[in-house]
Amino acid sequence: ITVNTLSLGVDMAMFNNRLDLSFDWYNRRAKDFADFGASVPALLGANPPRRNTAETETKGFELTVGWKDRINDFSYGATFVLSDYIGKVVKYDNPTKLLNNVWYDGMTMGEIWGYETEGLFKDEAEVAATDQSYLYANWYPGDVHYKDLNGDGKINVGNNTVDDPGDRKVIGNNTPRFSFGLTLNAEWRGFDASVFLQGVGKRDYMFSSASNYFWGFAGNQEHSTYYTIHTDRWSEDNPDGYYPRAYFNTTKNQLPQTRYLQNASYMRIKNLQLGYTLPKTITDKIKFQRARLFINVENLATFTSLPDIIDPEIISPDAKIYPLRRTWGVGANITF
């Protein structure tokens, strides 16, 4: 593999070093790593050898802005960090641009291909007027109604290529965009406080059919998990429910689609700490050089549109990772 990187940066400090700024932009080109190789006749009876011909390009930036100052007995500071990147496939040996989870020339890394949805089928007449037999044989009210994008009267994958994807399109991108962090701190007469916030500004996510945390039903009873959010499910008594008709034996309603594409952006109060440093008049009496008491909280709060049972920081396709816990702690820093 050959990697060439062009990087441009600037660092500056102003206002007697109270404000500092750092910015880096990069363009990274990776060449000569393995792809699946050219197609060979089936008569050969073996898969083609991999060849080092693939090429990608990644562009991104990192920005850091900091401010610190003191006003009499009060000192404070703030540091903001923002980064972003986007990757493209420049070259890959996929001349027909198949969509079988392989790259193709011009592809944006993290693309989510899926169906656009009309909603859930309302009645038998609507089911009868829509041909989704390619995806599954039987459909009923409460099932997902996929949209006929190419106007051929049936829902399918076409030739499963970029040029003929059937009724699919790029519906989102799961690359975390605009990752950020903000640190705030202050100190006044022995009291101190600091808080660290971090998150992702933009990200789309489509949970797989194996995600019982998101779907509730995951193809079989022993892997299914039913939470309060899953009670908002279609039924004859709840025709406007969010989740589709319930099944244990099919994933036809859980295909990548716009209805259940999730906004996975978030902001989390990752750490909050409050402290107090004992005055010297007290530490001298107890023979300490310095003593500081503090209380600390990890993962205090998370702001996201994802269901509460899914942690956006450690998200995975099947969403079976246990969320990060909120932890409290107290302690002391003592110097003898």
Task: Put a short name on every predicted segment.
Residues 1-116, 252, 256-336:
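Extracellular/periplasmic, surface-exposed regions of secreted and cell-surface proteins
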Residues 1-4, 57-61, 163, 172-180:
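Short, glycine/acidic-rich beta->alpha junctions
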Residues 26-31, 40-42, 199-203, 210-214:
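Active/binding-pocket-proximal capping segment
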Residues 35-39, 155-162, 242-251:
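Active-site-adjacent bridging/hinge elements
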Residues 70-174, 214, 225-226, 231-238:
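Conserved small-residue
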Residues 89, 166, 176-189, 270-275:
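Conserved SET/PR-domain catalytic core that frames the SAM/AdoMet-binding pocket
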